[in-house]
Amino acid sequence: MLNEDVMVNAITGSTGAGVKPGATSHFSWRNNNMSIYKPFSHQHVPEIKQSLKQLQNSFDSEIDFIPYRGDFPRGIFATLVVKCKVELEELVKMYTDYYAEDSFVHIIDKNIDLKQVVNTNKCLIHLEKHGDKLLIISCIDNC
């Protein structure tokens, strides 16, 4: 099903930087600011590729991952874009079936935002089709 390159953009709050404080993790630097870090070479790219291969053994396309530092303390807001010929209804059913036993993952039929997940264990996922492109949006509170 996934036979095309995957583009992932993810914006993380300051808590996504881990427990080790750094110059870019402080409010005074992040306030009213946004920046890219480790584009195309982030340490999580191999993990993302491994997860996709576990779901679809034939997956061997590129993963272009662009992480951003956001102007908020908690959460990760991520988008993924890939060419996909499968109809939206079938994709929503696949996602709903896959996460049916996971009480914290919710497939949502309208747009999502971080305020819906901050201070919760929830992961929200929203799917949209635009022509032959699939847009997957997800958000979590990463604390």
Residue spans for each PLM region:
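Short alpha-helices
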Residues: 1
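C-terminal substrate-binding/catalytic lobe of Rossmann-fold NAD(P)-dependent oxidoreductases
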Residues: 4-140
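A conserved FAD-binding loop/helix module that cradles the flavin
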Residues: 143
